Amino acid sequence: MGVFQKGEDQKGESANMKPIPLLSSYDMGKFNLSHRVVLAPLTRSRSYDNLPQSHAMEYYSQRATKGGLLIAEATGVSSDAQGMSVIPHTPGIWTKEQVEAWKPIVDAVHAKGGIFFCQIWHVGRASDMEERPISSTDKPIEKTEENYFLGFSTPRSLTVEEIPDVIKHFTLAAKNALEAGFDGVEVHAANGFLLDQFMKDGVNARADEYGGGVAGRCRFALEVVDAVAAEAGAGRTGVRLSPYSRCLDCADSDPDALAAHMARELGSRGVLYCNVVEPEMVATPAEGGSGGETMRIPHRLRAVREAFAGTLMVGGGYDREEGNWAVAGGYADLVVYGRLFLANPDLPRRFRLGAPLNGYDRATFYTADPVAGYTDYPFLDDDGDDGLAASAASASSNKSGDQDGV
């Protein structure tokens, strides 16, 4: 667990303004964070031909602050690691050209004093390519909670002999991320993608050492984490988990046990942080809903908090008020914001001032336009914006249903 510190006075903030937990400083290993508002890894589909583009320099630097943590969008570890035509143009980091393309983007974040981690992923069976994608299983995705796409290819089950090659791809991606200048690497083991497909028993029915009980199902993900940590250092390695998610037809029958196992294993390895997606459930009328809508299970991650000694990040629908609660109560060290940060490049400043938030434009989440819905969200007007201070309610009212990344 990192060190909680009393927040320093923020620029332009009145000395007698009530302290804001989200804006207190925090030591995450060797990294000194000036606040606890983290940019989620958000797929934006603007890396044409899997190559990061110059417009990403502006996008990320807009959201960078001195001592603020940004996590880059999911970045492929190999040519077959990404394959969703419905979400095209995702970046990679397996070639020299891609590494060179990332360098000026990373430099732009560092020029603002930001801390930048690269999220590395493999989509597994979440692919619609002609060549059969790899997974823990040969069963295709049959339904998605999102209902945005159902044309996934039928996967083939990865053989035990092939697993070391996939691990090598993650290792190379970690090496390349550091060469590009990133401060660290986040292993994407969440949201129904390859590593999650191994971890959850709703998908993984293998009878070998990579299946069966929770320890076997988590073996592959932990071998990837071990390899990445050996390359980058445990103090520069984070992991993203979503044990409670049903995303992409990938669910587990005992998510509490899965969450606790991964928290213990990652803690024993000394990885820098866990970035965990908040649990959700489908409400029934007896639970107070009209039936069928998704509702967050409040604060179910306490078991992860207790089992993992490193930095715990949480995300999935948090607003300003809830984020402050999570930090002040020790429920989490950092709070990850996706759609709120997407639409408000100056989100930490707006939180400080209690300022109104921009709404997001869902239609532009995954379009290829280098400006619209990407770098054109407005900042607060510098003329007189301090007059907006202390209206926390205005910020809290901008509930977004934020799911903090893909």
UniProtKB/Swiss-Prot annotation:
**InterPro entries attached to this UniProt entry:** Aldolase_TIM, OxRdtase_FMN_N, Oye-like
**Entries under CDD domains matching the protein:** OYE_like_FMN (cd02933)
Q: Which residues bind substrate?
A: H188, A189, A190, N191
Question: Does this UniProt record's set of keywords contain NADP?
Answer: yes
**Cofactor(s) listed in the protein's UniProt record:** FMN
Which Enzyme Commission numbers does its entry carry? 1.3.1.-
**UniProt keyword list:** Fatty acid biosynthesis, Fatty acid metabolism, Flavoprotein, FMN, Lipid biosynthesis, Lipid metabolism, NADP, Oxidoreductase, Oxylipin biosynthesis
Q: Does the entry feature the keyword Lipid biosynthesis, yes or no?
A: yes
**Gene3D superfamilies in the record:** Aldolase class I
Q: For binding FMN, which residues are annotated in this chain's numbering?
A: P41, L42, T43, A74, Q119, R240, G317, G338, R339
Question: What Pfam family is a match, any one?
Answer: Oxidored_FMN
Q: What class of enzyme is it?
A: oxidoreductase
Superkingdom assignment? Eukaryota
What GO molecular functions are on record for this protein?
FMN binding; oxidoreductase activity
Gene Ontology annotations of biological process type: fatty acid biosynthetic process; oxylipin biosynthetic process
Extract the signal peptide range: none
**Alphabetized PANTHER family for the sequence:** 12-OXOPHYTODIENOATE REDUCTASE 13-RELATED (PTHR22893:SF113), NADH OXIDOREDUCTASE-RELATED (PTHR22893)
Provide the family line: Belongs to the NADH:flavin oxidoreductase/NADH oxidase family.
Q: What does this protein do?
A: Putative oxophytodienoate reductase that may be involved in the biosynthesis or metabolism of oxylipin signaling molecules.
Q: What is this protein called?
A: Putative 12-oxophytodienoate reductase 12
Q: Which organism is it from?
A: Oryza sativa subsp. japonica
The gene from which this protein is expressed is OPR12
